Design a protein with these regions (language model features):
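Secretory/organelle targeting and membrane-embedding segments
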Residues: 1-141, 145-486
Length: 486
């Protein structure tokens, strides 16, 4: 097995390499998941001697891994590390990479592309022309794949000329989270849940992906992307699909992907006539988070410019099918919000009739909260009687399943799981090209409608939960946002 992270940046390695990829690979080493002769070859523009590269990786692990680094595992891991200088924007030098990989022709090769999406197609072509794509070769593409439907299709076509669809792994690390995987078990392994998982019992669904950090060093990249493209098109629509999809015939990747594609194609288009009623677009200004003053988005760009890129989005999405008709999915995501939290809230309908006296209190509708971060788990609010004599006093209490409390053994994080799935040739946790293109088709409708109605990003103060129009979005429907766990 050979893992080749190909970086396109001038400095050689993307932030994802340092924060996610390298720690994930090292954890696999700690768990003895690599064969003895496996190699990890990092390719970048930098002319980096091997000993300097090994020291660079060690520094990255010390910075991004909690606790001490296992000395024995590090010794094995360091032996696997190699660096190759390659400018992925150049037509030359690829034969040298072929020489570096010589002797591994019968091994699984994983090409992990951490670069601008516009380079995915040309890089795949260069790999093929240099004879690097052997029978066991797989390619990993980071999100977002493209900037819109047309660019996504072009990238998929270009990469598809070299790699079979079954060997293309479009990675979305949210799909590797244990709680996301547990959505399948929660829905389809519990007879208590599935009969209620429909419009008759569920009032609405909320999906929140909130960050308290700003764009920071990624501001230049983010200004070309925005929250709608960066978060909604992939992470949030994938979560929506897992909540809304019908039961697949099996856990085979073709069955799972097929059901998700049906959901994406059933999303009601957002048009210029509806866009102001069902979407909110915001951009953070300066404010305070955890008692510290933080700059606004335009200040972080490092130059005076009137950027209209959104850093916050709220959307009322509707799935037009029999299961979910008239049951809205409210999505919100943004940067510089009041806390870091990702969760799905399934709000059930109130009981049809209360048998309790007024002084007992009104029974609160049940609510299921599926937490993705910071503490992965599932919480179900149930109405119970407060202990004591006299009349009934009702109170909602949570039944809480916290994975960290229940399972004391460390389980692989999202990137670790996904990398091992790539090596095992298991594509169920990755996106098919039809998913990517169907998602872009819906997202493009929002972008075009924003432009048609000249709907600009409205300012919100850092450290809040986004623009106040997001509150009004639900208030118009007689609903309100649930307070996220932070």
């Amino acid at each position: 097995m050979v893992v080749v992270p190909l970086g396109g940046g001038e400095q050689g390695f993307a932030a994802t390499d340092l924060r996610k990829l390298l720690p994930a690979l090292f954890h696999r080493e700690v768990d003895c998941q690599f064969s003895t002769d496996s190699r990890i070859i990092a390719s970048s523009r930098k002319d980096l001697p091997r000993e300097d590269f090994v020291a660079f990786v060690r520094q990255a692990l010390e910075e991004h891994l909690p606790g001490d680094i296992d000395a024995e595992a590090w010794g094995r891991f360091a032996e696997r590390l190699h660096h190759h200088r390659q400018d992925v924007t150049s037509d030359t030098g690829w034969d040298s990479l072929h020489d570096t990989l010589s002797g591994d022709d019968d091994r699984i090769r994983v090409f992990y592309l951490a670069m601008l999406p516009s380079l995915y197609g040309p890089t795949a072509t260069h790999l093929a022309q240099a004879g690097l794509v052997n029978e066991g070769a797989r390619i990993v593409l980071e999100k977002p794949v493209g900037q819109d439907f047309d660019s996504a299709r072009r990238i998929n076509d270009e990469v598809g000329e070299v790699f079979e669809e079954s060997n293309i792994y479009r990675i979305d690390h949210y799909l590797g989270k244990e709680t996301v995987q547990n959505l399948m078990a929660l829905r389809f392994a519990n007879s208590l849940v599935e009969p209620l998982w429909r419009r008759g019992a569920i009032d609405h669904v909320q999906i929140t992906v909130a960050e308290n950090l700003g764009a920071g060093e990624r501001a230049a990249f983010y200004d070309r992307t925005g929250t709608l493209r960066d978060m909604v098109q992939n992470h949030m629509l994938q979560l929506l699909c897992l909540v809304a999809m019908e039961a697949p015939a099996s856990l085979d990747h073709r069955d799972i992907r097929g059901e998700k594609i049906k959901v994406l194609r059933a999303l009601r288009p957002i048009t210029p006539d509806s866009v102001r009623q069902v979407t909110v677009r915001g951009q953070y200004t300066s404010g305070a988070i955890d008692g510290k003053v933080v700059p606004g988005y335009r200040e972080e760009l490092g130059e005076e410019r009137d950027s209209e890129t959104e850093t916050f989005v709220a959307i009322k999405a509707e799935v037009d099918n029999w299961r979910w008709a008239d049951t809205p999915f409210y999505l919100r995501s943004g940067k510089r919000l009041a806390g870091k939290s990702s969760e799905i809230v399934v709000q059930f309908r109130p009981i049809a009739h209360s048998i309790f006296r007024a002084e007992s209190g009104v029974p609160e509708p049940n609510r299921m909260t599926i937490r993705l971060q910071p503490d992965e788990g599932v919480e179900l609010s149930m109405v119970t009687k407060v202990p004591g004599p006299g009349h009934f006093k009702l109170r909602a209490l949570p039944l809480n399943l916290s994975f960290s409390d229940t399972y004391d053994k460390r389980y692989p994080d999202a990137y670790e799981r996904l990398l091992m799935e790539v090596l095992l040739g298991a594509p169920a946790l990755f996106m098919h090209r039809d998913e990517v293109e169907s998602a872009w088709n819906w997202i493009d409708g929002i972008i075009d409608s924003w432009a048609a109605r000249e709907m600009t990003a409205q300012p919100y103060v850092s450290g809040t939960w986004g623009h106040t129009d997001a509150v009004r979005l639900l208030d118009r429907d007689g609903r309100e946002w649930c307070q996220p766990h932070v």
